[in-house]
Amino acid sequence: MAEDDMVSLLFKLKVEDVTCSDDPEKHMKNASNERKPLIEPVENQLMDIGEEGGSLDYWLLYLYVDCLTMMCCFHRGSLPYNWMQGALLTNLPSYQHDVTLDEVNRGLKSASDFFGYVDPMRSDYFTAFSFPGRVTKLNEQMELTSTKGRCLKFDLYASTQLRFKPGELVRHGECKFAIG
């Protein structure tokens, strides 16, 4: 069903100001070279979360999903089932610079036993929520190993109420974990 929605959005997409080029390969390389500094992490770079917008005074929980699911959350106002009892969220921030995406996937898979976390591409996006009093803190924690070998622990939360209010989804985007 979500795939049908995305396909219908693509059919409605209008592309304007397209010109024909005699050397598309050259333009593709130029575009790729311009994009590289934007996507390649710099050693020991910390993300300035102030750039994300919004107040940082409230408590945030993160849901790690693929791009399509993130967009469905954003447009439909509902959480996906990614756990046997609803939605599994964590307080692991999406810009944790000393944890790799593979390690996050390993931790989420062991915590949730959800098949979706086998492939790192299924969780390289996030949605961040502010749920005052709507989630249950689980007794277990997600244990991750940092890139420096330290053990990091993050709390896990469950939500059986999958619909959320528009103001509760406060951020969404691509994860900024360490490369490794």
Swiss-Prot record:
Keywords: Cytokinin biosynthesis, Glycosidase, Hydrolase. GO terms for biological process: carbohydrate metabolic process; cytokinin biosynthetic process. Coiled coil: none annotated. GO terms for molecular function: beta-glucosidase activity. It comes from the Eukaryota. Its EC number is 3.2.1.-. InterPro entries: Glyco_hydro_41 (IPR006065). Hydrolyzes cytokinin glucosides thus liberating free cytokinins. This is Cytokinin-beta-glucosidase 1. The lineage of its organism: Eukaryota, Viridiplantae, Streptophyta, Embryophyta, Tracheophyta. The gene is ROLC1.
